């Protein structure tokens, strides 16, 4: 991983990642690229002052965003899958397809259902119709799923 100061659209032969150091989605994208031994350039954006080139490429304005040749990938799970398919270490060969499917299912549950409930609990004052305890309890389903997986 090479940190760069700007995006160079003429240099598309090396994957380029718009990232943010503390974003968990960007972290897992970087980890997958590194784990797959893919050399890439990373540009750490400032969330309060997003570069216009970044917004031109991905109007959604969220990180991570990977650019390689003419392809733009703006979801961390898709960047992870791209990295493991393209990487020289062929990480997929380490796992059975069933294990990959289980992992992807857990990631999706985390990113969608659990994150929604966790945000409601974290910002409970925005949800006055539910008690903080009820909001907390709504997060437990995911922890129970993880607990069952760990018991296997």
Residue spans of the language-model regions?
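GST-like domain detector, emphasizing the conserved glutathione-binding G-site
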Residues: 1-144, 151
């Amino acid at each position: 991983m090479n940190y760069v100061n700007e995006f160079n659209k003429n240099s598309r032969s090396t994957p380029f990642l718009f990232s943010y150091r503390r974003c968990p989605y960007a972290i897992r994208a970087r980890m997958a690229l590194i784990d797959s031994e893919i050399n890439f350039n990373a540009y750490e954006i400032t969330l309060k002052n997003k570069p216009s080139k970044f917004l031109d490429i991905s109007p959604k304005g969220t990180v991570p965003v990977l650019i390689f040749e003419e392809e733009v990938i703006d979801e961390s799970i898709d960047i992870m899958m791209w990295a493991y398919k393209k990487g020289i270490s062929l990480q997929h060969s380490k796992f059975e397809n069933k294990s990959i499917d289980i992992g992807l299912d857990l990631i999706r549950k985390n990113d969608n259902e659990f994150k929604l409930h966790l945000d409601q609990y974290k910002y409970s004052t925005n949800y006055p119709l539910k008690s903080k305890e009820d909001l907390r309890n709504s997060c437990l389903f995911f922890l129970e799923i993880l607990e069952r997986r760990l018991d296997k």
